[in-house]
Design a protein with these regions (language model features):
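N-terminal membrane topogenic signal
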Residues: 2-18, 101-106
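Membrane-interface coil-to-helix junctions
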Residues: 24-78, 85
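Membrane-interface micro-motifs in multi-pass membrane enzymes
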Residues: 36-39, 54-58, 78, 82, ...
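Transmembrane helices and adjacent periplasmic/lumenal helix-loop junctions
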Residues: 125-128, 147-192, 203-211
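Membrane-embedded alpha-helical segments of integral membrane proteins
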Residues: 191-258
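Internal/C-terminal transmembrane anchor helices
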Residues: 262-286
């Protein structure tokens, strides 16, 4: 007997499964990673700070990220909040690809940008607003595909490009790139008008540079904007963007695939293998567990759990000076250092 699952329930179950899987991944690979990130950022509850930040390109996601990160002093909070955002990104990406291609064959590949973003969160120099900006971009693409009129879609895209640059920053470049790819397959003869959005983003970036909001072009147009300015971003920061562009290029070809069960099954299996290989090969490359013990100790310090620090240090080698400092600090707080 065939069991029919209502669509809302199916979406909820898919989101819940993804949420649990991502939460488990974060917990296994670095339970105290997000707690460590919280100690490097401070959210200032001041009207002048909020207003000044909000007026800058990307100010909205920067304020939202700062507000969320303050809850990361509880290790589980950072894991659950980030897993929630990445699960939403996966569902939106799946919905966009399905609505655009007319089939649901690319849902395994929709995990690729999610995995890439998950890797970025283990880099302490990655800015949390990068994930929020990515989510906001997908929201724009979702509504774009709901508009049938070509002219209305372009007007909406123009307005949302300006809105996205103002609220989320350089992610507007990726938004315009994906829009051009989408429209090139939907309306090939009319997609040239979307090239004007490139000029719009360029002018917005130029204005931001004139105002001194950005110091370099790469911070106004590329993914480097979501990496700390103190260090060069490297190629890893461009991974989610590059994967997304490649995914949409492949998605355009999937629009013309014949609906054959054997072919569909083979494509799903191949995509599953690709995602598995990417996760298996990327985890050791982008995730380091060398400092996990130190992150755990700093989290305990942040929460004033001095007895827990002393007990934890009994089970770890004390040749590491950072571990020694944490141990001595706990003893000092307990007034036991001289003893």
């Amino acid at each position: 007997m065939k069991i029919s699952i209502p669509k809302p329930l199916g979406l909820f179950l898919a989101w819940m499964f993804t949420f649990i899987a991502i939460s488990s991944f974060f917990y296994i690979m670095g339970a105290y990673n997000f707690c460590y990130l919280e100690q490097w950022q401070t959210f200032v509850y001041d009207s002048s700070y909020v207003s000044n930040t909000f007026m800058q390109p990307g100010g909205l996601v920067q304020l939202t990220a700062g507000f969320l990160i303050q809850f990361f002093h509880m290790p589980i909070a950072g894991i659950l909040i980030t897993a929630f955002l990445l699960s939403a990104i996966f569902l939106l990406m799946t919905h966009i690809l399905k609505r655009w291609t007319g089939n649901n064959l690319l849902w395994p590949s929709a995990l690729l940008p999610v995995v890439a973003l998950a890797f970025m969160h283990f880099n302490t120099n990655y800015l949390y607003e990068g994930t929020l900006a990515f989510l906001l971009m997908l929201v724009g693409l979702t509504f774009h595909l709901c508009i049938r009129s070509t002219i209305s879609r372009f007007i909406y895209s123009l307005c949302y490009t300006v809105f996205l640059f103002a609220t989320a920053g350089s992610i507007a470049s990726l938004y315009v790139t994906l829009l051009i790819i989408i429209e090139a397959f939907i309306t090939p003869k009319k997609c040239a008008i979307y090239l004007l959005l490139i000029l719009v983003v360029y002018l917005l970036a130029q204005y931001a540079l004139w105002e001194g909001w950005f110091g370099e072009w790469k911070h106004a147009l590329l993914a480097d904007a979501y990496f700390t300015r103190r260090l060069p971003a490297g190629s890893a920061i461009h991974l989610p963007w590059g994967i997304s562009i490649g995914l949409f290029l492949v998605g355009g070809l999937f629009r013309y695939l014949p609906n054959k069960p054997n072919l569909n099954r083979a494509l799903l299996i191949i995509q599953g293998i690709v995602v598995g290989v990417f996760l298996y090969q990327g985890a050791p490359q982008y995730i380091s567990k060398d400092n996990e013990t130190f992150k755990e100790l700093t989290c305990l310090i942040d929460n004033g759990q001095w007895d827990a620090i002393i007990d934890r240090c009994k089970d770890i080698p004390m040749t590491n000076l950072l571990h020694q400092n944490c141990f001595n600090l706990a003893f000092a707080e307990k007034d036991c250092l001289l003893q």
